[in-house]
UniProtKB/Swiss-Prot annotation:
This is Prokaryotic ubiquitin-like protein UBact. Residues 1-65 are annotated as: Disordered. The gene is ubact. One of its GO terms (molecular function) is protein tag activity. There is a cross-link at E65 (Isoglutamyl lysine isopeptide (Glu-Lys) (interchain with K-? in acceptor proteins)). Pfam families: UBact (PF20513). It comes from Methylacidiphilum infernorum (isolate V4).
């Protein structure tokens, strides 16, 4: 049994890659990423210390603060 695989000589079309825009960019009709501010880490850590001090410490280590 012989399997014929299409090659570029046999008419397979090459797809041209179009670079995608960065996050939040793009002027196309598709959905766009929301433009949101980065949360204030000091406020997050203060709230986390009230709830669970150990979790706040682990978060601080994980984020490099």
């Amino acid at each position: 049994m012989e399997v014929n695989m299409p090659t570029t000589e046999q008419g397979q079309k090459n797809k041209q890659m179009i670079p995608s825009p960065g996050p939040g960019g793009g002027s196309g009709p598709g959905p766009q990423a929301p433009k949101v501010e980065k949360p204030n880490t000091e406020e997050i850590l203060k709230r986390m210390r009230k709830v669970d001090p150990d979790q706040a410490r682990r978060y601080r280590q994980r984020t490099g603060e």
